Amino acid sequence: MQEQYRPEEIESKVQLHWDEKRTFEVTEDESKEKYYCLSMLPYPSGRLHMGHVRNYTIGDVVARYQRMLGKNVLQPIGWDAFGLPAEGAAVKNNTAPAPWTYDNIAYMKNQLKTLGFGYDWSREIATCTPEYYRWEQKFFTELYKKGLVYKKTSAVNWCPNDQTVLANEQVIDGCCWRCDTKVERKEIPQWFIKITAYADELLRDLDKLDHWPDTVKTMQRNWIGRSEGVEITFDVKGYDNTLTVYTTRPDTFMGATYLAVAAGHPLAQKAAANNAELAAFIDECRNTKVAEAEMATMEKKGVDTGYKAIHPLTGEEIPVWAANFVLMEYGTGAVMAVPGHDQRDYEFASKYGLTIKPVILAADGSEPDLSEQALTEKGVLFNSGEFDGLAFEAAFNAIADKLAEKGVGERKVNYRLRDWGVSRQRYWGAPIPMVTLEDGTVLPTPEDQLPVILPEDVVMDGITSPIKADPEWAKTTVNGMPALRETDTFDTFMESSWYYARYTCPQYQEGMLDSKAANYWLPVDIYIGGIEHAIMHLLYFRFFHKLMRDAGMVTSDEPAKQLLCQGMVLADAFYYVGENGERNWVSPVDAIVERDEKGRIVKAKDAAGHELVYTGMSKMSKSKNNGIDPQVMVERYGADTVRLFMMFASPADMTLEWQESGVEGANRFIKRVWKLVYEHTAKGPVAALNVDALSEDQKALRRDVHKTIAKVTDDIGRRQTFNTAIAAIMELMNKLAKAPQEGEQDRALLQEALQAVVRMLNPFTPHVCFTLWQELGGEGDIDNAPWPVADEQAMVENTTLVVVQVNGKVRGKITVPVDATEEQVRERAGQEHLVAKYLDGVTVRKVIYVPGKLLNLVVG
């Protein structure tokens, strides 16, 4: 064994061994308990960042630990390879998205291997290959036949200059990110999957997810947004159709003083024909894309359409306004307004001088004061005719019943959740497998024409999708009739919604999934990824699992038993102000800092001498130039050090502050373990451990070893507090380093302890542990070694600590055998010099003894 720890030599050698032996390749084995450990698959952006490293290290620690428990562990990896960034990069680098993507995959795969992650590479998938997306296309056609897929027009962001659809992220201040043209809202036909058909089940089954974070479940509950209310129909004077609204507060119905419709509503469009102000307002709304999140804070605007609706219970005429806070794509595109009891309606009514009618009493029973704001709390009705005096629930039911009786209202459960629009007008995605005949008939692509392959050898102009720009690509025939292919591609959330299931059978050619393999491995036992995916990906992931279940492919209801959301990785951020007042962000690697006695940064400059402003720790990002390249750290310290720091610096679900001093500390610890094993093995063979022959000190040390095993097992396995597990191993190492190494049983005990330490560290630092296990004469490869088991007998305490008081004041602590009598404890206390001096020349008048805990001597 070399005296010096040299990670660069060890790590490449061990990685080669894993590759050659295919250590982490697994197959279904009914005789073993399975464990499926999955980290969210990466987008091949070009390089791994620290967020990736943290996510995958957590996954690898769990997988290696479970493997040592004797389970059949599947830990796969792949590439979420379609998406918009590839198109931008291709234009910038004058290439096509496919070669750019495949080059990135090759580079990042090498990076993952360098970090020593124990993946089953035989199951690697890239979602941009026809071998993968063909099954997604086939499944989509089956969902279409089941009535779960439909096409309808929907509003998108349209750049009139580039003649293309923009994602919300590509609209900057209402303009196209590329050419700065004013963006318009345009209705175009798009494909949707009916996720709303599963809304109730998606909501209900959240209760089954005991091992998912409550925050994620709450976010999904709110996103699905189930509400119970009443749908009410209004007649409108001089308009051919009725207006339908939905309300969760029918108790306030007698206070409805106006209706509001979306600018795109047919009623508003009709009224605009003779109303120039309204036409201009509709035009303005068309060109302002409003994210739902901004709705609450934006200025509420509207124009009177001139139409009057008839209140179904009072017969009163109430005005119908067009308003910018009503969205056509939500509900019916019309809302009833009760300004007395809804703040948004109140602000709008106050602005335009509309009637505000109170119908709910204040909590003290008085009429509410509406001079400043609406009264939004529930309460008792007044000003409501026959419903006066009713509280919320009774009023809800009475008014709902009355409306139903008159045929103008019905109770309804509504969801905030909208159907999933899966069409993207981009090139780099899986083609949507639908065709249109010359007579306009829309059909799914016949199975014998699947997959519809995306051409990869294309020229990108940065504006139009190559498959839209080439009219020949779309031409095909179906049953001998000419047809045109759909040129839209799937939303990339499609691929990431079922990849976890395909990992169970990536080579399977008979269909989307091999049910036998899928049902052996699924559900996923632990799924690890960022909380930013709480609603989009994690909802589609659950939805797709239910679709596959209903297609008979899987039997479980949910895709993953446990979800672990890792925290972000933060780093110091610095900038200097440039000549034009702009901020120039400087990498923390290039900042020369001065710290105070508490280690806080007080001054910083860069190599060019710029005075730097320190903004504190923030998420590693390109925009702040504060990302640390994992590659550089691995080259400097080794993969094991980077992994150990990642797991030790913070609990897995909390933010992690990147500190190179902490990385150095992790490196020093590994060197200490190496040094102790080196010194121990240099002394030659070790005798067998004879537990019965151990001295009290040796027993105490062995007790510490086994208590540590018990703690680390609990910390990793049950609590998943990996940082405290590492801290416990470090504490034990301190004791082992000070332990005597000369006697035969000292060395035998150290051998047992070091073999345990190396196995406990193996999930965190697998390369160095692989090597040290061999040096310690461990049986076989450590990858197949069992997890150490704590010896219950060794952990039994045979001594205990007793606090000694004289006249109620603590004067010392003594160690006594667990079974010591009161007499023996008193005798031992008298020998303790700190206690003895208080007993000199005095009489003990009374003794209070709490067995094994406290001895109080009352003297006079």
From Swiss-Prot:
A motif ('KMSKS' region) lies at residues 619-623. GO terms for biological process: leucyl-tRNA aminoacylation. The keyword Nucleotide-binding applies. PANTHER family: LEUCINE--TRNA LIGASE, MITOCHONDRIAL, LEUCYL-TRNA SYNTHETASE. The lineage of its organism: Bacteria, Pseudomonadati, Pseudomonadota, Gammaproteobacteria, Enterobacterales. The keyword Transcription regulation does not apply. Pfam families: Anticodon_1, tRNA-synt_1, tRNA-synt_1_2, tRNA-synt_1g. PROSITE patterns: AA_TRNA_LIGASE_I. This is Leucine--tRNA ligase. Its main location: cytoplasm. Its EC number is 6.1.1.4. NCBIfam families: leuS_bact (TIGR00396). Signal peptide: none annotated. Keywords: Aminoacyl-tRNA synthetase, ATP-binding, Cytoplasm, Ligase, Nucleotide-binding, Protein biosynthesis. It catalyses: tRNA(Leu) + L-leucine + ATP = L-leucyl-tRNA(Leu) + AMP + diphosphate. Belongs to the class-I aminoacyl-tRNA synthetase family. Transmembrane segments: none annotated. SUPFAM superfamilies: Anticodon-binding domain of a subclass of class I aminoacyl-tRNA synthetases, Nucleotidylyl transferase, ValRS/IleRS/LeuRS editing domain. Gene3D superfamilies: 2.20.28.290, 3.10.20.590, HUPs, Isoleucyl-tRNA Synthetase, Domain 1. GO terms for cellular component: cytosol. ATP binds at residue 622. The gene is leuS. It is found in: Cytoplasm. It comes from Salmonella typhimurium (strain LT2 / SGSC1412 / ATCC 700720). A motif ('HIGH' region) lies at residues 42-52.
